[in-house]
């Protein structure tokens, strides 16, 4: 027998201080689930942290090449996007001249560079140092050329359930200016701007291990990046390194990762100097807010 399940999610378009905030999950006698910031008898604490986890340490690598004259440090960028890197040498010993300042560089996509060559002050003794590498996706020298974005979906109309500086989850530098739009699972998600697909995740089921769920990250020509999160498993139709046009189908919306209901989490980010942060943007068409939305299914 089919059973209708209704989920009511209270996600007001909140602004104000940027801090984490306690949400209460309450199920009534009819099985209706409500998320609210008001404590109720029988409610459970539900802390929602919608953060994005992208692991790029396997794509940005520091290689040490030893030779008769000393050692050369070679940096590899296997990503389809530039990466800003900073290399510090700590606990230095027996290095001719020493390396007093950190070395900062922007590696082009899919490239490698000989960053430093170190020679020993005493050729009979080994070099001593500890390499500390810091890096961030993107080129901080590029500046955004627009803050107006076409709607990244087909169909609708759909409603905004959480906006910039939202207390439920939009309080970190990476997600402060993100927008959440409630929509049925399976809604076509399209590229808001043309660019190159940098990273995708397509195999996560439910909450999984990544709070972002399934996602697509696209690098735009001005150095900004559009990121589409909580996508339906198996629906991502683009590949890393692929060039896409504005309006190209990317995937279908879902409810994967740290998601309280079916929606698209869309954010625009850029490298602000060894850190990726979200930046303000607007859709070029009005999207009304909806404090409460309900979805039903069988």
Residues of each region from the PLM?
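Active-site loop architecture of trypsin-fold serine endopeptidases
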Residues: 204-212, 253-265
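Active-site region of chymotrypsin-like
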Residues: 176, 213-240
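Short hydrophobic beta/alpha edge segments that flank linear recognition/processing sites
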Residues: 215-216, 244-257
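Short, cationic interaction patches enriched in Lys/Arg with P/S/T/G and frequent prolines
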Residues: 2, 16-119, 124-128
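Bacterial N-terminal signal peptides
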Residues: 7-17
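Surface-exposed, glycine-biased beta-strand/turn segments
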Residues: 103-212
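Acidic, glycine-rich catalytic/binding loops that coordinate metals and/or anionic ligands
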Residues: 145-164, 170, 174, 185, ...
């Amino acid at each position: 027998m089919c059973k209708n399940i209704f989920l009511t999610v209270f996600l007001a378009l909140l602004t104000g201080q940027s801090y984490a905030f306690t949400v209460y999950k309450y199920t009534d006698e009819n099985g209706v689930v409500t998320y609210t910031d008001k404590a109720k008898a029988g409610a459970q604490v539900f802390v929602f942290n919608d953060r994005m986890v992208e692991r790029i340490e396997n794509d940005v690598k520091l290689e040490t090449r030893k030779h008769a004259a000393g050692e050369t440090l070679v940096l590899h960028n296997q990503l389809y996007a530039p990466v800003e890197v900073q290399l510090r040498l700590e606990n230095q010993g027996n290095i001719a001249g020493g390396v007093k300042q950190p070395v900062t560089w922007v590696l082009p996509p899919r490239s490698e560079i000989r960053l430093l060559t170190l020679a020993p002050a005493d050729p009979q003794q080994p070099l001593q140092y500890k390499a500390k590498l810091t890096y961030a996706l993107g080129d901080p020298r590029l500046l955004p050329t627009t803050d107006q974005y076409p709607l990244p979906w087909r169909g609708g109309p759909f409603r905004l359930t959480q906006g910039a500086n939202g207390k439920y989850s939009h309080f970190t530098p990476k997600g402060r200016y993100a927008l959440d739009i409630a929509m049925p699972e399976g809604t076509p998600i399209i590229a808001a701007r043309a660019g190159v697909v940098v990273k995708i995740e397509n195999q996560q089921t439910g909450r999984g291990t990544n709070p972002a769920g399934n996602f697509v990250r696209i690098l735009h020509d001005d150095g900004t990046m559009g990121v589409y999160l909580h996508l339906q498993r198996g629906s991502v139709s683009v590949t890393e390194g692929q060039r896409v046009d504005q309006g190209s189908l990317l995937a279908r919306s879902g409810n994967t990762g740290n998601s309280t209901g079916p929606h698209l989490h869309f954010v625009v980010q850029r490298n602000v100097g060894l850190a990726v942060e979200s930046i303000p943007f607007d859709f070029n068409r009005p999207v009304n807010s909806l404090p409460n939305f309900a979805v039903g299914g069988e």
